[in-house]
């Protein structure tokens, strides 16, 4: 008998194997291969998740560094790089496929959408605009306009998707926190991107009146509306198309703005007939429209699409970002910088020119106009430090030195949602209980460069009632001798350096009434009592202040209902008002 070879024995064993064994191995093979693929895909997905996490954390760190005072350009470069990496990783086909997995898919989608949104902000908007700002090739707005418009369109669906994800209960804590954080940023940024092209004249030229207030003659919203500049925005290009000063409007009288008898009683019969007094009422929209009416009656019929207020205090902060500017002075060029701008604009100019004379008025008007033009040129060209400019603008808005009004309802609604930029008092107490305390010079002087002010306010709750007590103190910090040496234009038009007439207006929180008053000083009293404005009880005081004198007025308001935390709105003064607030109700 011939024995089978090894190969023949192996073949025979294979032929005699049970079908169930072969099927088992086949099943194991079919199970093992997909399992291996899934494990590899999960490993790849885990790697991509780690990449996204690392990149987003790095981007966040760069932003925090910039907010803490770091270099903005470097931060933008870092955010751009990390956001691009995160968006690329989250856009991986494996990632997108995994988004259909129940529960986990929602979290992956949340991370992806957040990463893609940051990528659009950083790489389709932020970095290109920053590069334009740094390239020194002139005005950036016309070049940046299409970038902003395209970026806004790309960002809009991501903004909407993130807003919807905020309420998704499937998101785990870290993912939801990141989604909410990015969504909140986009909810503020998206309206800007949507509105900015139109504001810059992408859909037709827009005309904006720039109003310069003089804080040396304080009025509730800032100071005498001494100078105006008309700026035209046309497809991103900005140009000065007209300028005027307060003397332009001398003797103009009524300009057709409807003013109630109550307002004339509260602010005086000349309110609405003199442009410098247009900022008397602490409501920038009404003041802006009044200034526009003056312009249209005396200068030209240019349609005013909006008005922006700025004062020397804001200007000094802006000069920190742009660097010094040079303006022709009485005996050669004058350098204005962030340290000397307020002093020069609010005191030195009155030493150089006597504005009561025709020649002096022309000289000072030309100086202010040249200053406005130089600052406009520096800002519109993009020749400034981005971090310092962001601080200058935000600080000035917070202190009331920059305000804006737009005729377009959608644009105005956005401004009003932006807080103090609108220059209006809240209409209720749901978010804050805002008390208005405003100062007003009525001596036709520029003495308030030397005026020091303070406000002390408190909120208490007892027996179902809420009380707000506020005191305002004014100190005219100049000696009689020094006051007598001041230029005539700085002294009181009526009383020289003998005394200066001042008003203080307390605007009660909505729903509160006057409970009591108190006054300290040689000549101070309440006047024009029983008035309401802007839905609030108003408590006005008048005083006469010789050099070196101090006056304090105090009012307690009382009311029942719900009141938010106490806050103060006040006049931006040359010497910043010292404010103390205590609130034992919250």
PLM ranges: what are they?
Residues 2-10, 18, 30-35, 44-580, ...:
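Non-catalytic, solvent-exposed segments at the cell envelope interface
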């Amino acid at each position: 008998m011939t024995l089978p070879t090894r190969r023949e024995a192996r073949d025979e064993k294979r032929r005699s194997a049970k079908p169930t064994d072969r099927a088992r191995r086949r099943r194991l093979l079919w199970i093992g291969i997909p399992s291996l693929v899934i494990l590899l895909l999960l490993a790849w997905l885990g790697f991509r998740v780690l990449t996204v996490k690392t990149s987003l954390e790095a981007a966040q760190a760069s932003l925090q560094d910039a907010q803490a005072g770091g270099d903005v350009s470097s931060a933008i470069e870092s955010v751009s790089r990390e956001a691009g990496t995160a968006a690329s990783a989250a856009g991986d086909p494996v990632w997108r496929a995994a988004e259909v997995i129940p529960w986990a898919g929602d979290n992956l989608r949340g991370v992806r959408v957040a990463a893609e949104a940051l990528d659009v902000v950083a790489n389709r908007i932020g970095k290109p605009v920053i590069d334009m700002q740094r390239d020194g090739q002139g005005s950036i707005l016309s070049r940046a306009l299409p970038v902003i418009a395209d970026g806004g369109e790309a960002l809009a669906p991501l903004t909407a998707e993130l807003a919807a994800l905020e309420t998704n209960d499937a998101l785990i804590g870290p993912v939801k926190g990141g989604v909410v954080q990015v969504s909140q940023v986009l909810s503020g940024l998206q309206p800007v991107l949507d509105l900015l092209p139109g504001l810059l004249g992408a859909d037709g030229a827009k005309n904006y009146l720039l109003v310069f207030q003089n804080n040396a003659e304080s009025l509730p919203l800032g100071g005498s509306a001494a100078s105006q500049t008309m700026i035209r925005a046309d497809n991103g290009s900005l140009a000065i198309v007209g300028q005027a000063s307060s003397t332009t409007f001398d003797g103009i009288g009524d300009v057709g703005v409807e003013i109630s008898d109550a307002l004339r009683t509260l602010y005086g019969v000349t309110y609405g007939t003199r442009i410098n007094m247009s900022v008397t009422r602490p409501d920038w929209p009404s003041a802006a429209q009044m200034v526009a009416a003056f312009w249209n009656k005396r200068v030209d019929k240019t349609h005013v699409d909006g008005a922006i207020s700025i004062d020397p205090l804001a200007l000094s902060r802006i000069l920190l970002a742009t660097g010094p500017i040079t303006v022709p002075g009485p005996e050669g060029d004058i350098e204005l910088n962030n340290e000397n701008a307020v002093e020069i604009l609010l005191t030195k100019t009155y030493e150089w020119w006597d504005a009561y004379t025709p020649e002096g008025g022309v000289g000072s008007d030309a100086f202010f106009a040249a200053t406005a033009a130089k600052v406009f040129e520096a800002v519109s060209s993009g020749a400034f430090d981005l971090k310092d400019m962001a601080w200058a603008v935000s600080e000035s808005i917070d202190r009331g030195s920059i305000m804006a009004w737009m005729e377009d309802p959608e644009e105005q609604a956005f401004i009003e949602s932006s807080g103090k930029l609108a220059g209006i008092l809240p209409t209720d107490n749901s978010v804050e209980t805002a008390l208005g305390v405003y100062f007003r010079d009525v001596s036709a002087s520029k003495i308030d460069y030397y005026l020091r002010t303070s406000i002390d306010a408190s909120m208490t709750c007892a027996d179902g009632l809420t009380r707000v007590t506020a005191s305002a103190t004014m100190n005219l910090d100049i000696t009689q001798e020094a006051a007598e040496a001041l230029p005539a234009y700085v002294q009181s038009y009526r009383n020289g350096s003998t005394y200066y007439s001042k008003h203080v207006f307390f605007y009660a929180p909505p729903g509160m009434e006057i409970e009591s008053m108190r006054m300290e000083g040689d000549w101070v009293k309440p006047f024009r009592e029983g008035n309401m404005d802007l839905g609030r009880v108003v408590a006005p005081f008048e005083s006469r202040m010789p050099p070196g004198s101090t006056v304090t007025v105090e009012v307690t308001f009382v009311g029942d209902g719900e009141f938010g935390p106490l806050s103060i709105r006040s006049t931006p003064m040359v010497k910043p008002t010292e404010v103390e607030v205590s609130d034992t109700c919250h």
